[in-house]
């Protein structure tokens, strides 16, 4: 493991202590709306025992929402930060989720395993090469009739939150992260055959829906 990756892990381990507060400030009243939007977009109501993988799951808010909504789901949260996973494991319903420590660019699963693979507000923080590898890995592990759901930020409108957003991106985001966000769905169209884009009602986040 490189010194850079170890350093990033230490950063996220430390950030895990204030992560939920940061999201609360950024999302304000739209936090639950954003999660519901992602979970509803999975359209798993008619699927028996669906399998869902949440990449870069952080403190587990999204994958725990899947576990709450679908009683028979096999829900797996995947993150390379032990600190984030500890926070996730301490939350309500965590006993219904399997949390795994690992690298998004090298998933420890076989091909065509999951009905849904999702990644919420984290892909832009990966380095360009790792980001591309992670997308190919998501494509590999999702079922042929499954979906990859990528939720990303729209640039915040409020001046203070916008400033904090760019400061965090400057500190830990790779050099191409702003460019990646500006490109919209183009990076996804280079990997997946079918890509569509939708937005939350609040306009704070966008959802990229990808199929093999």
Label each residue range with its predicted role.
Residues 3-6, 62, 149-204:
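C-terminal alpha-helical "lid/dimerization" subdomain adjacent to the S-adenosyl-L-methionine
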Residues 53-55, 59-106:
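Class I SAM-dependent methyltransferase SAM/SAH-binding core
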Residues 132-144:
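A short glycine-rich, Lys/Arg-flanked "PGG" loop and its adjoining helix->strand segment in the class I
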